[in-house]
Every structure is written in C-alpha cells, then in structure tokens.
Amino acid sequence: MTNEEKRLIADCRVMIIGALDFIDNVKAELYRSGFKSINIVSGNDVHTEIGTVDMVAEYVGAGRICIKEEVKIPIIYPFDFVNGAGAIVIMPGDDNELQHKDNLRLWVAEYMAGYCAFWNVEGCEWLQLALPAIRKAKTSDAAQRTAAHICARIAANIAVGRNVKHFPRFYLSKNLD
C-alpha cells in the first residue's frame, strides 16, 4: 500500500450502523486497515440523516435497513452466515432495492446460495448447508469476524478509489477461523 493510499484511508470518514457486538468487530478491522474517523450509530436508530461521512457500513441482521433515504455515498452491508460471511455494496446511483426487504440477512443468504447453485460456483456449498441455521436467526462469532474483515477490505478499496463489486454482485467467504 502506498503512502497516498494510507492517507486516503486515514482521511476517509466511515459510519458504522448496527448491533453493538458486530460494531466492535467492524471498528477493530477498520482501525487495523488504517481508518481513523469512525462514527458509531446503534442499529436501533432509524437514520434519516447520514451527515458528513464518506461511506456507511450497516449491519442489518434479521431486521430491515436503517437508512431510508437515497444516499450519495457507498453503503456496505456485511452479513454473518454462521459458517461464513458475505457483503453487498450499494454504490451511488444504484437502485437500493434492499431497503424494502424484510429479514434482509435471510433474503441475501438465499439470493447468494441461489446464484451459486444456478451458476455452479464452487466453494459455496457451506452457505446452502447454513440456510436452516440462518432461517433460525443463528449467528456465530467467527462469521461476524469474517464479515467485519470483508467489510474493512471493501471499505479500504473504496477509500483508495479501486473498483468494487456492487449489487447484484457480492462478496462471499467461508469463515477465516
């Protein structure tokens, strides 16, 4: 990583929205990646104003999205899927149809599993096997740490101007532990 990229990451303002235990994981990964300006918002607060940040990382869990306005900054939605994790990015100008989904975590898990099955993507079997646990709203600490790591990597790439996959494309990984 160049000094300029390190500066861009340090100067980038990130807002994390979600459950406190998950926020702690994301915050730690963002700090490890070099982010300095991190704003924390409890997931219980429905947000109408984003404020002055450069991107948002919102952990939804089994609920609905807190940000209800059309935003002009990237939004990263990390998900813990018990045996692994995934993330979806909404970039400015993208249609954020995710705003209208109930139980977004389950919807995304089924979407990703269906995509992998349809396109015969190797290495996704763990997600299909995790769907019953996801339907029961089970989580795991390892999956939350993996989701936080994925989120921080995406945030760093956005901060330095690299292209990232955005919805309908996604990121998916087995647990790192």
Which residues fall in each region the model found?
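N-terminal charged helix/coil linker that caps or initiates catalytic domains
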Residues: 1-15, 32-33, 45, 169-170
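Cofactor-binding loop segments of dinucleotide-utilizing enzymes, especially the Rossmann-like FAD-
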Residues: 19, 42-43, 80
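Hydrophobic/small residue at the entry helix of a nucleotide-binding pocket
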Residues: 22
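Rossmann-fold NAD(P)-dependent oxidoreductase module
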Residues: 25-33
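NAD(P)-binding Rossmann-fold cofactor-contacting core
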Residues: 36-47
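E1/E1-like adenylate-forming module used to activate ubiquitin-like modifiers
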Residues: 50-146, 173-176
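Oxidoreductase and adenylate-handling cofactor-binding alpha/beta cores
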Residues: 149-165
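A short, charged, Gly/Pro-tolerant segment at domain boundaries
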Residues: 161-177
